[in-house]
Structures are given as C-alpha cells and as structure tokens.
From Swiss-Prot:
Family label: Belongs to the three-finger toxin family. Short-chain subfamily. Type IA cytotoxin sub-subfamily.
CDD domains membership: TFP_snake_toxin (cd00206)
Disulphide-bonded residues: 3-21, 14-38, 42-53, 54-59
Protein name, UniProt field: Cytotoxin 1
Record-level GO cellular component terms: extracellular region; membrane; other organism cell membrane
GO biological process annotation, one example: killing of cells of another organism
Subcellular location: Secreted; Target cell membrane
Domain of life: Eukaryota
Subunit structure: Monomer in solution; Homodimer and oligomer in the presence of negatively charged lipids forming a pore with a size ranging between 20 and 30 Angstroms.
Tissue expression from the record: Expressed by the venom gland.
Length: 60
C-alpha cells in the first residue's frame, strides 16, 4: 500500500466521507491482501485480520 500526498493521474482518490485508504490482510498470510479500498475510520486489528491504513485519501 502506497500513500501519496500528491495526485499523479494513475493514483485513485477516495470518495467523500471515506477518506482513508486501507488494505486488509489475514494474519496467517500477510503477503496476500484480502481487500483494499476506502474507509471512513481505520479498523482495529483482530486475531484474524490485520489492517494497514493511510492517513490520506490517495493511494494505489
């Protein structure tokens, strides 16, 4: 997950209201992201899932 301050054309921006990029991993397999997208609040990690969040709404 790359977080970006500037907006090159090929980076996506999140819609209003969901202004954090995030990526979700299974704790057992951190190399394969399960889901990625935009979210309003960064979720807390659990025993099964680990979240990586940007503090910006621009990511790839």
């Amino acid at each position: 997950l790359k977080c970006n301050k500037l907006v090159p054309l090929f980076y996506k921006t999140c819609p209003a209201g969901k202004n954090l990029c995030y990526k979700m991993f299974m704790v057992s397999n951190k190399t394969v992201p399960v889901k990625r997208g935009c979210i309003d609040v960064c979720p807390k990690n659990s025993l099964v899932l680990k979240y990586v969040c940007c503090n910006t709404d621009r990511c790839n």
